[in-house]
């Protein structure tokens, strides 16, 4: 009797009357046109190992001949075993693929009442603020602007140019928690969580498996090798790889393509991860304030005391997911786009400008049940138009994002610098040394030196004189530069908005 032990996918074990055959490393499930395996064949304590494609007749013949000589077993017996093994592995592969497909969330059929409730939500006046309130009631604590920004970016997965977002902060600050809780408001069939990501793993997805999906990467720090194909997928909306297929009588080059577009969300503690991906993604900094700590701890106490209505939370999550399900893939046209300017100081202005425009479109897209449906008379394509209110909402939500993209300092250094300014002003100190600040701010000397070097090189600090203890005494060149940059960005956005309003008034 032939049996295939499927307990360990990485070490399948086949047994029949004569042979025990281990399939080391398992088999690939993504291809049906080949069956490449590494076999460990055993008969009466004699062992033979061989790697081959079981669909390649030449390789199978060579295996049978060599195994017969090594194991001292008839070629007919080994032939029967290999044929039986091949059939067992084919059935195993089909079963596994069917199981994988069965595990994929299937589109949900909404009832008439559910559709009615979802439409009612999407037609609500002041939709963004109402949505943000619901997000908070669903269990997302604090992070008022970040959570709404993230939700709109996740919504953009349904558009032709999805946006991407990176959550940044130190370990234990709640990056993954924010991403996970907001993602729970997106339908299961439209999102996928990825924990173990390598460069080659992207090519195992089916051609359209990622198309218009939300991809959640919990730890970008551990996925550095996969960032190149990820960037290609974000920018070009597809990735392609060629390999040589040797399963037939003649090797041939085969191309494997995975298509987007895809909305990518990830978390990181490393600034370099952001620097390399900043021109493709929005960056949010997690709220690490004492007030946020207090909010979270109070919520935890309320949960423990049984005072949180978990049923209400689940109903809100379902409502928000259903509202996402009924959003249609409509085109958005922004009639004011040519009037919209960004501060010249922003990092990578061309990309940032595109992100700014796409974010405005995403807000319009989310308001589609409150917009007039227009039809292009030439192409017959349906579309909706951006309103001035959409631009106002985008400016409000993106102000901090644009500020970070305009800042020449790294995010961590900026955070340190603002803390340093507050301390020096409070203590009425004008000059300082590395050792002095390390002691006063309770930061490691190496970190302080690194920050001061960056601040000096970028002309935020100047050397006042040499210190008696060695090193230098520093002085801050301007205490108002960050505030001035904020005011400049606000002023430019306001001026642009006024131009749009004036254009509308003159119509």
Q: Where is each model-derived feature located?
A:
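Conserved ASCE/P-loop NTPase catalytic core
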Residues: 139, 148, 153-312, 321-326
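Phosphate-sensing "switch" segment of ASCE/P-loop ATPases
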Residues: 255-262, 270-418, 422
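AAA+ P-loop NTPase catalytic core
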Residues: 90-147, 160-165, 377-435, 440
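Short hinge/gating elements
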Residues: 113-118, 130-137, 163-168, 212-215, ...
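Short, hydrophobic-biased segments on the C-terminal half of alpha helices
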Residues: 183, 357, 452-453
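N-terminal nucleic-acid engagement/recognition segments and initiation subdomains in replication
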Residues: 1-159, 506-507
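Terminal-proximal interaction/regulatory segments of ATP-powered molecular machines
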Residues: 408-507
């Amino acid at each position: 009797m032939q049996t295939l032990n499927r307990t360990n996918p990485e070490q399948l074990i086949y047994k029949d009357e004569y042979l025990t055959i281990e399939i080391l490393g398992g088999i690939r499930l993504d291809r049906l046109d080949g069956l490449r395996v590494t076999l460990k064949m055993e008969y009466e304590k004699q062992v033979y190992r061989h790697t081959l494609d079981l669909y390649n007749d030449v390789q199978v013949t060579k295996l049978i001949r060599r195994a017969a000589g090594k194991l001292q077993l008839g070629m007919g017996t080994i032939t029967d075993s290999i044929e039986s093994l091949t059939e067992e592995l084919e059935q195993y592969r089909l079963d596994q693929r069917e199981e994988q497909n069965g595990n994929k969330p299937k589109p949900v059929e909404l009832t008439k009442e559910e559709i009615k409730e979802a439409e009612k939500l999407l037609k609500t006046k002041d939709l963004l603020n109402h949505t943000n309130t619901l997000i908070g009631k669903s269990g997302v604590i604090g992070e008022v602007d970040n959570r709404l920004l993230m939700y709109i970016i996740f919504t953009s997965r349904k558009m032709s140019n999805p946006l991407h977002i990176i959550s940044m902060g130190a370990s234990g600050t709640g990056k993954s928690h924010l991403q996970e809780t907001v993602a729970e408001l997106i339908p299961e069939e439209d999102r996928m969580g990825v924990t173990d990501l390598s460069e080659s793993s992207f090519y195992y997805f089916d051609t359209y498996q990622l198309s218009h999906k939300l991809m959640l990467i919990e730890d970008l720090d551990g996925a550095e090798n996969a960032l190149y194909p990820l960037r290609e997928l974000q920018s070009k909306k597809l990735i392609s790889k060629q390999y040589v297929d040797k399963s037939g009588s003649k090797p041939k080059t085969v191309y494997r393509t995975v298509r987007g577009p895809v909305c990518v969300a990830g978390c990181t503690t490393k600034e370099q991860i952001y620097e390399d991906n900043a021109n493709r993604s929005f960056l949010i900094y997690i709220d690490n304030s004492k007030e946020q700590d207090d909010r979270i701890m109070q919520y935890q106490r309320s949960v423990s005391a049984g005072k949180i209505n978990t049923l209400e939370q689940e109903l809100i999550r379902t409502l928000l997911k259903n509202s996402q399900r009924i959003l249609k893939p409509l085109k958005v046209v922004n009639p004011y786009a040519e009037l919209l300017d960004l501060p010249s100081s922003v990092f990578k202005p061309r990309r940032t400008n595109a992100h700014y425009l796409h974010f405005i479109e995403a807000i319009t897209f989310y308001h589609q049940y409150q917009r007039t449906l227009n039809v292009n008379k030439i192409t017959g394509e349906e579309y909706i138009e951006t309103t001035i209110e959409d631009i106002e909402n985008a400016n409000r939500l993106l102000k901090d994002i644009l500020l970070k993209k305009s800042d020449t300092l790294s995010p961590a250094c900026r955070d340190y610098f603002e803390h340093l300014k507050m301390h020096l002003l409070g203590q009425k100190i004008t000059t300082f040394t590395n050792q002095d600040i390390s002691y006063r701010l309770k930061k490691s000397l190496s970190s302080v030196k690194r920050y001061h070097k960056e601040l000096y090189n970028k002309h935020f600090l100047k050397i006042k004189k040499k210190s008696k203890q060695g090193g230098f005494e520093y002085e801050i060149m301007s205490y108002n530069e960050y505030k001035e940059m904020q005011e400049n960005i606000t002023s430019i956005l306001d001026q642009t908005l006024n131009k749009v309003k004036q254009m509308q008034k003159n119509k």
